[in-house]
């Protein structure tokens, strides 16, 4: 990995050693620079828009369900990253949008 979290994983401090701002975008900016933040936000935006386009285009209930859950949960995670440390503490929550997005893409591929 990169940045302060990876450094923390290799340190000997067991509790209370991780001090990061409660904003994942600030942390990503420090770890990956502005290019990393812009690329991440671009990927988030593309997933949200594509999910809602798929929701409008397809009639299959499973595809629509995966699309709306992927798009809305991605938007929720992106907003939560502004006020909390989603990347550091909630990796399970961070993976839900990508899981539903992958299921949506698989269902679309299976329909063709």
Segments predicted by a language model, with ranges:
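Long extracytoplasmic/lumenal interhelical loops at the membrane interface
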Residues: 1-32
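Hydrophobic transmembrane alpha-helices and their immediate junctions
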Residues: 32-75
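Extended hydrophobic-aromatic, low-complexity segments
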Residues: 1, 37-39, 112
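N-terminal low-complexity, intrinsically disordered patches enriched in charged
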Residues: 10-12, 42-45, 111
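Transmembrane alpha-helices of multi-pass inner-membrane enzymes
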Residues: 67-112
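Generic hydrophobic alpha-helical membrane-span motif
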Residues: 7-9, 39-42, 90
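Generic recognition of well-ordered alpha-helical segments
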Residues: 24, 28-34, 47, 74-78, ...
